[in-house]
């Protein structure tokens, strides 16, 4: 558990991911740091793991590819990052192997998050991921996407606890590395029993739990219920990672003070802000927090993302780059007009020209 010496009242999320709200009373360097307990240890079935960084990057479908992970690593070299979600059935058929086979190319710890409704397929996928170098296996029991939940995967397992526990037991019995679970408070408020579900996961063999503070019914609406996460934390003996509405170092300190969690996982807040994990990590250690990149640095980062995606994905890279550029190009004068132009640019050359013209107005350097 990371214990903060003083809890602070909760504030609304920042309008720009990874950036404090305007009017924030003090820079992060002056906030009371937590009592740093050292690396987080996760028990495996013969192969334990240690996390030097207690800030985890969530798997993000269509986002957390190797290019994105490399950017996060620039600010957080020791953090546990994840591949995009991997469908166990697709992996079995050979369609998702690229996400797993590229693990060896990453410089730091990489977890593989699996989803499916078949225990045997999940166990076999876990074996493949372990053989490819996965740091740990995470089981997705929280994805709210309807087509996944309807087939019994992701948050659909919240409606079938018996199957959920069979999957955990099967995966835990198939690998030596730690098996963790990412889940939500429940399917809906009226039926949610997060403490009971979490205890069952622990008993089935989960060695850590990441808990998003919303139900599947909520999706990403409303506020994450950190108090509910705290109740689950008090009931467990395995580590608990808090997730939901952590978009700044200040949010992370408040979340840990309220929940008593062993760490935090950030997800959507890093879209366009790959520096967020590193800034939170510094805050939790009581170290000076790296500044948020300025406009010129953001534009240089956007240009770097564009070239990396074009090199990796060819013509399709431009389509993928648009969303990343849209997230990155925020928080400075003229950003809205630039984003509009980037979404309409039909060629790499036109996109490069827009970024270059914008950078000329600010001056740019690599963040």
PLM feature segments, named:
Residues 55-58, 81-83, 110-114, 137, ...:
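Hydrophobic faces of well-ordered beta-strands that scaffold small-molecule active sites
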Residues 157-161, 222, 295:
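Flexible, glycine- and charge-enriched loops at secondary-structure boundaries
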Residues 99-100, 152-158:
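Short glycine-enriched, charge-decorated loop/helix-capping segments at active-site entrances
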Residues 123-137, 141-151, 162-238:
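Alpha/beta enzyme core
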Residues 33-47, 60-135:
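Glycine-rich, positively charged N-terminal anion/phosphate-binding segment
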Residues 1-51, 55-56, 61, 166, ...:
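Alpha/beta catalytic cores of nucleotide-metabolism and tRNA/nucleoside-modifying enzymes
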Residues 60-62, 86-88, 115-117, 142-144, ...:
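Active-site beta-loop-alpha junctions enriched in small/polar residues
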């Amino acid at each position: 558990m990371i214990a903060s010496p003083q809890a602070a009242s909760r504030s609304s999320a920042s309008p720009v991911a990874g950036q404090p709200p305007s009017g924030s009373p003090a820079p992060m360097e002056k906030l009371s740091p937590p009592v740093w307990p050292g690396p987080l240890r996760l028990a495996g079935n013969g192969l334990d793991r240690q996390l030097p960084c207690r800030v985890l990057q969530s798997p993000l479908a269509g986002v957390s590819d190797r290019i994105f992970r490399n950017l996060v690593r620039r600010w957080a070299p020791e953090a546990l990052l994840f591949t995009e979600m991997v469908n166990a059935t697709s992996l079995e058929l050979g369609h998702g192997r690229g996400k797993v086979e590229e693990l060896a190319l990453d410089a730091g710890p990489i977890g593989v998050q699996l989803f499916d409704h078949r225990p045997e397929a999940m166990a076999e996928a876990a074996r493949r991921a372990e053989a490819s170098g996965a740091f740990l296996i995470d089981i997705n029991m929280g994805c709210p996407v309807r087509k996944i939940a309807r087939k019994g995967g992701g948050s659909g397992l919240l409606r079938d606890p018996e199957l959920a526990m069979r999957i955990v037991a099967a995966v835990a019995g198939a690998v030596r590395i730690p098996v963790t679970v990412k889940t939500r408070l429940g399917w809906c408020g009226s039926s949610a029993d997060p403490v009971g579900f979490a205890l069952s996961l622990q008993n089935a063999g989960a060695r850590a739990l990441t808990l998003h503070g919303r139900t599947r019914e909520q999706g990403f609406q409303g506020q994450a219920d950190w108090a509910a996460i705290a109740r689950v934390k008090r009931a467990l003996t395995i580590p608990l990672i808090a997730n939901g509405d952590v978009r700044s170092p200040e949010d992370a300190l408040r979340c840990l003070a309220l929940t008593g969690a062993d760490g935090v996982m950030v997800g959507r807040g890093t879209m366009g802000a790959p520096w967020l994990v590193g800034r939170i990590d510094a805050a939790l250690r009581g170290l000076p927090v790296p500044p948020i990149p300025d406009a010129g640095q953001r534009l240089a980062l956007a240009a770097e993302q564009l070239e990396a995606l074009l090199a990796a994905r060819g013509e399709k890279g431009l389509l993928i780059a648009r969303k990343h550029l849209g997230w990155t190009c925020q928080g400075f004068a003229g950003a809205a007009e630039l984003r509009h132009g980037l979404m309409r640019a039909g060629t790499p050359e036109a996109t490069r020209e827009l970024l270059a013209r914008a950078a000329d107005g600010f001056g740019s350097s690599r963040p």
